[in-house]
Amino acid sequence: MRKIYATGKRKTAIAKVWLTPGKGELSINEQSLNQWLGGHEAIKMKVMQPLLLTKQEQSVDIKAVVFGGGYSAQAEALRHGISKALNAYDIAFRAILKPKGLLTRDSRVVERKKYGKRKARRSPQFSKR
């Protein structure tokens, strides 16, 4: 019985994922998916997407530790980590996950604030007179 480790990232959120063959148990920060997310069905589907695409929702156990960012970024980091772990588990899943963009790290992050500006791009109000 092999244990596979992978990390997923999105914005400032980081997910550490351990995948083992099992019966479909999903533990995130020592909680079930429903306890961790509450009633956010769309975000739950994001997390489950790689498992549903590869039809592994009943055959692998996933233990994850997620920190940083908000719920949506954490869910996408978790999805990225699960996808990478499934790819390491069986290389045949790459053909399913890669076209959906689940193995690609979303590199969009917050733009830095520049001096002389109020935010990244917002300038102070201009007065002609």
Curated annotation (Swiss-Prot):
<comment type="similarity">
    <text>Belongs to the universal ribosomal protein uS9 family.</text>
</comment>
<keyword id="KW-0687">Ribonucleoprotein</keyword>
<dbReference type="InterPro" id="IPR023035">
    <property type="entry name" value="Ribosomal_uS9_bac/plastid"/>
</dbReference>
<dbReference type="InterPro" id="IPR000754">
    <property type="entry name" value="Ribosomal_uS9"/>
</dbReference>
<dbReference type="GO" id="GO:0003735">
    <property type="term" value="F:structural constituent of ribosome"/>
</dbReference>
<keyword id="KW-0689">Ribosomal protein</keyword>
<dbReference type="GO" id="GO:0006412">
    <property type="term" value="P:translation"/>
</dbReference>
<protein>
    <recommendedName>
        <fullName>Small ribosomal subunit protein uS9</fullName>
    </recommendedName>
</protein>
<dbReference type="Pfam" id="PF00380">
    <property type="entry name" value="Ribosomal_S9"/>
</dbReference>
<dbReference type="GO" id="GO:0022627">
    <property type="term" value="C:cytosolic small ribosomal subunit"/>
</dbReference>
<dbReference type="GO" id="GO:0003723">
    <property type="term" value="F:RNA binding"/>
</dbReference>
<dbReference type="InterPro" id="IPR020568">
    <property type="entry name" value="Ribosomal_Su5_D2-typ_SF"/>
</dbReference>
<dbReference type="InterPro" id="IPR020574">
    <property type="entry name" value="Ribosomal_uS9_CS"/>
</dbReference>
<dbReference type="InterPro" id="IPR014721">
    <property type="entry name" value="Ribsml_uS5_D2-typ_fold_subgr"/>
</dbReference>
